[in-house]
Amino acid sequence: MRAALFALITALTGVIAQIPNSPRFDLTKPSYDLWRNKKTAAITVQQSFTFDNVNRRLFIVNRRDGSALDSGDLTISQLDFSGKVLGSMDLLGCGHGVNIAAEPVGSDTYIWSETDAAASGYGTALWKFKFQNGKTLNSATDKRKRIVPLPEFDRGTATIDPVYKRLIVRYQTGSVQNIAAFDLAKASAGNFSNPLAKWEIPHLVKELGAKVNVFQGYAAYGRYVYFLTGESYDASGGKLNSEVMALDLDTGKLVQGPVITKAGSTLKFREPEGMAIYKTVSGEVRLFLGFASGVAGDRRSNLFYKNELI
């Protein structure tokens, strides 16, 4: 009887979702400050950020000071939650830094990032390494294992859902951007044979309705993946066009948005840069949005969060 019922449900629905339902963030609700105008270990625009939810650490990635735009050289800063720089390390020839992920392993934090940057400055694979203050990793000489989760994986980046323990990657095949999700424990062990989800990202403007086709970061919590889009005031002619949206991680369908976010609207320059999920000690789950501010030669980090779930 149970088998017959399963067969009937499968026939009616077509596909059984591998990612169960969960609460999601209401993107229309206000954003709150964690900080504004904080320095990192680099003076360039922050590209993204991530949290180690177990060891309570925060990391921000920038292009390395003095490196060319297409060099793939990055600086990862560790900051405390008041914005004080605690340490940093450099990555040479690795990528653009669109997204990084932090995986706690005991008392250590391992960073997932791009590596082996092409002439474009974007990475062609992923790798994972322990954050160590003061250390420099050079992709040209470092022999640690490269991670290529799927065929034709290019310009790939990663984010981790720290609550539901999943690794989500965004990557390019040809000219198409894609999302894939994996069980974190399996992915960390090198097993990418059974993606929980895998789909092409709809065109940000033509299909999802964003104001501009400028992708600035993503984060995942439960059944949903969140995108941040938009330009700096310098690029937009002073117009605020930053938006957030929620998509079903199982299907790729738009669930909410695009919603204009006015977080940090008075900041100078104000370029959207990065998203991440953090769960506080008290259990509150937060969707963080990052923005760069300041002037060339003195860029600053700004982090805001939404915390209302529906």
Where are these regions (language model features)?
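Short glycine/acidic-enriched loop and turn motifs that connect beta-strands
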Residues: R64-L69, D116-G121, T173-Q177, S232-S236, ...
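Blade-loop segments of beta-propeller domains
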Residues: L74-T115
